[in-house]
Amino acid sequence: MALEELYREVILDHYRNPRNRGHLDAPDASAEGVNPLCGDEIHLELALEGDKVVAVAVEGQGCSISQASASMMTEAIKGKTRAEIEDLTAKFRLMMSLDGDGDLDLDPDRPGQVLGDLEALQGVRKYPVRIKCASLGWTVLADALAE
């Protein structure tokens, strides 16, 4: 299976079987966002213990890219501190901003492990209009953490 096909399967899996879907009983932080260009919607809730995200829930509707990205993001941030999430967010945004077809190599000692499933979204950067779809959840996350 080619890498691009594998990435497509990862995206479709997260779209069809979104992780952390629903609501939290008593979220410590929440935010929502809409991509006005295509109508994607994300509502995110976080439970925090100190500086660490201990639970996360997401609801939304929209294209497969926005919903899969939000699902992957919730998996990636669970158990992480704000500082770790800021670092992860910066790496995700870097990946989405790169030009060309080259693979992102954020950590040569751990290829494919820095962003995990999120690396499946690398191909989106070839379609600039879709970058906002993939980034919506991350924008909502930043808003929630800024509360």
What are these regions (language model features)?
Residues 38, 63, 133:
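Functionally engaged cysteine thiol sites
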Residues 42, 71, 132:
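Active-site phosphate/pyrophosphate-handling residues
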Residues 60-67:
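Short, thiol/selenol-centered motifs that function as redox-active sites or metal-ligating centers
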Residues 67-68, 87:
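Alpha-helical macromolecular-interaction surfaces
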